[in-house]
Amino acid sequence: MTEPVPPVVGFKRHLGTAVVPGDAVYVLSEEGATALRGPHLESLVPLLDGTRDFAALRRELPAGIPADEAAAVLTRLAEAGLIGLRPGVSDAESAYWDAVDGEAGRGRVAVLGADPATTDVLRAAGLTVAEDADLSLVLCDDYLADHLSDVDAEHRRTGRPWLLAKPLGARVWLGPFFTPGDGPCWHCLAARLWGNRPAEAHVRDALGLPGPVPRPPVALAPLTAVALNLVALEAVKWLAGQRYPGQRALWTFDSRDLTGERHEVRARPQCASCGNPDLVRDRTRRPVVPASRPKSRTDGGGHRALPPEQVLEEYRHLVSPLTGVVKELRRDTRGPALFASFRSGPNTALGRRGAERLRTALRSENGGKGVTPIQAEVGALCEALERHSGHYDGDEERVRASFRSLGDKAVHPDTCQLFHERQFADRARLNARHGPFQFVGEPFDDDEVLDWTPVWSLTRGEHRLFPTALLYFDAPGPPSVLADSNGNAAGGTLEDAVLQGMLEVVERDAVALWWYNRTRQPAVDLAASGDPWIAELCEVYAGLGRELWVLDVTSDLGVPALAAVSRHVGGPREAIMLGFGAHLDPAVALRRALTELNQMMPAVLDGWDGGDDPDAVRWLRDATVATEPYLLPAPGRPVLRPDASSPDLLADVNLVRRRLEDAGLEVFVLDQTRPDIGLPVVKVIVPGLRGFWGRFAPGRLYDVPVRLGRLTEPHGYDDLNPMRIFL
């Protein structure tokens, strides 16, 4: 019987050593060199070459080195991870496993979608290809191929992990590992991938395809060989027990410039395949109950529950052009640095109809504004997440019925959309003349059966039903009901989001009352603000050859609402641009109006002429302060408004709500927070308040200016401003 060969002791096989007498022992690896100094090291290190077991090492100890001192040196080297026990075999492959602190991976793999060359590569890596396997390798031409749904279902049934890869194409895709019952499934990944391929999704739906649009194969033998060997490497590491966060990611390798990128893949808790598809419905059924929430900041960026740095840290993982909810965050460099404007991908609030018509509109992308770059970056991120959360997914709570059959349980959409009967009658001409933001739908049919979603009334403390298509972008519904972004808001907490949504509907109502009635409003004294940022901003605008002023357009609701206006001087075109802001703190309202103006300005400075938005084209081409005198401040002293904000967001929410209710209005909040996003998102709805798009039904638009003393009698329909707000 052969005696077992004892393990040898030596430096890890990926480490080299060099003794410099009188200086140090140097340990070298791919990562660099480390100098070791201490008693007996220069004498002991040559013996640790991996050819001796402990007995041989003890026999060959140099004279003068006691065994206990030698043992102490070896212990310290072992604790540092430099030496260890191992078999006597030493080669490049075993050195690799020492370098990654593991043992050689061996196991059985099943392969789907591969050619014979793949099997050869796997066998060369020491793997056994068999149907009864520990791991499946699934190779495909496209990660959205429809057959992968069946592959995913089968692996979830058996519990076998699988690795997805696309070894073809100029850009190779590898990963993630799917482990049934733990982490995301293929459907979680597919939802994100389709979300970042909207044009292809449109083609797929238009042509009735089961999966992605077929593409011609792209391959190069050296690249394919590299890709297959990377697949084999990841499989070997997995079977060796190697685990690291990147295995949950999609890794791409671009052969054109040899760059690699990692795109995180996370489970969607509401996934119909691996999660709980009732999560969104359950949230909608619950009451919306704001709680006390002290503010963390009360600076010019707004009164918020969380600092922007924390928000960015918590939600940055959602940014990726492949697996993210947000495609990108990029600074808009077309204007001065003080503008601090960021962009964050396509604006889904346009819906498919609007996106097709407004590819170059001012609002065709999500954006963020702020006094500082971090505020603007977080604003862009949150706006994109807000838009995504407001997009129809199909798992929303819905009741199918007609308005007439629901009775008092439902809110009529006309109280929210506020189109005039003459707009319905003239809709064909109006829709041809104006952009999608001004689109006039068909008259609502009270007997038509459609989907309704419950929305919580803060005023009544109960749910009432609104048309689902009024609440979610691209939700199926009749052409009489259209969703828009008015009142959609995100925040660090629910209370934060509710307050921002309330302030937005108040702001847009105030702007509409001023704009469409064309009343002159008092100016805000910018010099008296004492804000050094505003003083610097005025200088920047002057350097651009532009005038800057701000109007107070506050309505009967008493929440400070401001309109910032800028025009170019010294030329035939004034290229007038605007920005709006509202807040209980008038200083914050002022900064918000100015930062929104800053957000709009880069496009104008870049020569934008309105793109394919006819309202913007007419405005930038024709509008001047001479033709639109309501843009100029009214004579008289500026109005000074008190700061009514408090240190707690709940108190602010309740104050704005009371002011709305005192005006005879009801406040609704729909919680649109998505489980896979986490950022609180709401839609605030106040029937009767005006959006700032051209919707001219009777109501506040005509009555409030008279009550405020701006007009002696209400304007008629034909007297309203023919220029539409295009922001």
Predicted regions and their residues:
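Long, low-complexity, charged/polar intrinsically disordered regions in eukaryotic proteins
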Residues: 1-32
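Long, charge-rich, low-complexity alpha-helical segments
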Residues: 23, 29-129, 164, 171-180, ...
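Helix-biased "structured C-terminal domain" signature
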Residues: 63, 76, 259-727
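Short amphipathic alpha-helical segments and helix-helix/interface helices
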Residues: 74, 119, 148-156, 538, ...
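E1/E1-like adenylate-forming module used to activate ubiquitin-like modifiers
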Residues: 121, 133-227, 237-242, 254-286
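Hydrophobic beta-strand scaffold residues
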Residues: 129, 162-163, 548, 667
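Short glycine/serine- and small hydrophobic-enriched flexible loop segments
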Residues: 230-238, 382
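Polybasic (Lys/Arg-rich)
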Residues: 248-254
